[in-house]
Every structure is written in C-alpha cells, then in structure tokens.
Amino acid sequence: MKLAQILAEMEKQLEAVGEEAESLSFTFRISKNLSFTQFVLKMQAEATEDDIELLKKIQSQLLVHRPAQYIIGNAEFHGHSFKVDERVLIPRPETEELVNLILSENQNSSLKVLDIGTGSGAIALSLAIDRDNWQVTASDISSNALELAQENAEVIDVAIDFVQSDCFQAITGKYDIIVSNPPYISETDREEVGLNVLTSEPHLALFAVEDGYAVYRKIAENAQKHLTEKGKIYLEIGYKQGEYVKKLFESAFPKMRIRVLQDQFGKDRMVVVDRG
C-alpha cells in the first residue's frame, strides 16, 4: 500500500477528534527532514515498516492533542529554530511582529533590553541575534522555562543574561526597552483556547487573573523605576484588550505616548509606551 493511502486514513481519524489533518503530514515531513518535493515523491512510494511506525507514533500523540512542535521538539521563529517542550509556550507568528516592530523602531543605538516572561527565549534571543550591540536580559518566573531558554541560547550561540523573577521582583537597574508577551488569557475565555493548547502548553504562561490583566498591571505599576529617561515598553496583548491596556498605561504614564497597534490580521495585538 502506498504511504499516501495510509496517511489519508490516519488523517481521517485525527479529524474525528478535532485535530487538523495536516499536522500529521507536516510532523512526518519535518521528522524525516524531507523537502516538500521529497515528501510528495515518498507519498507515492510503497510504505515501509519504519515509515508506518513513525506515522503511528506521531498520530498517537496528535490524538491526545499534543502540538506538532512539541512532537518535533522545535519551532521556527523569526528565521531561527527554537527548542520547545511542555515547559514553555510555542512561539506564535504574532510575536514575530512584536520583534519586528522593536527592531524597526530601534535600529542603531546600543541599548539595554529586558524581556519579561521570556519562555523559550524567542523574543530575547531574536533581538540579540539582530542587534549584537544590545545588552539583553531574559527573565521568567519559571525556572523550568529559564532552563530551556538557556539551552536555546547555547544552541544558537548568543550571549544574554538570565534572571528568575516574578516581573520586576528580582530585577535591578534601568532599561532602554522593556518587552513582554505575558500570560493574558482570562479564565472566562478558556473556551476559546484550542484543546492542544489547553492540554499541553503551560497554564502559568497562558492564563492570568484579574480578567487577564494581572501582569499588565504589575508592569504598569513598577516599570517606571526600571526605565531609562527615553525608555520604551513593548507589549503583546490579547485582541480584545487594547483599550483597557491603553488606559492602564495612560494612567501610569500620563506624560508618555501610548499606542495600540494591529497585527497582520487587523486585530489589536501590541501596545507601545514611549516619549513620542
């Protein structure tokens, strides 16, 4: 039997439990390190025992809603491959837009940067890769997340600092840029979250009390003493949170400009605090 026939049958089983059928072929192709052309040719060939065994192994994990990136063990972000597992969130394309915004607005200077809630280190390391004259510090409340972020720094061969901290609790000094993609999903919005996210990704990095605004409040209340005179704050937000977060920072920073910016789909996704 051709591999394509076996794959099609397995994909139907995935669709029956609400999983995307394409996850199986994607994970198989990446696991075998095949180009798209090589994958298409392989699908038309007779299935080998090894290939069938690999498909079954992948499918068994997808059936219990384990994300493809965790199965593969890495995720692509901003042109680089980051190791990911259940210790951290899988980096999202929307967060790449936040990184691109920071890079486009801060091009030449040597800056000090603090990433709050670094997770896999995707934001901090991406900034450090593109701006080798920046001094970047990555912080997280989770020691497990920091451990993985440090592994990514070693693999990518980028030197940044790491601090275990609940927001600013263990942070000293002032920074030119404070960036954060914090947990911002409220418990009332839990039903909007996909099963593969709920069952596998760390809830500490997903959900926040106070209707999802707890970490934004902490940042608003404490960032001032950790910002340089011309310092800026860049935040990722939930698509329904723009106006509230804007008002929160307008109250905390009455003399600064607060911008709500949209992602590529036209949804509120970033808040920027700067001097204008």
Whereabouts are the PLM-identified features?
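Non-catalytic accessory regions of SAM-dependent methyltransferases
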Residues: 1-47
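Residue-level signal for inorganic ion chemistry
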Residues: 27, 65, 95, 123, ...
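Active-site beta-alpha loop architecture of Rossmann-like, nucleotide-cofactor-dependent enzymes
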Residues: 69, 185-188, 240
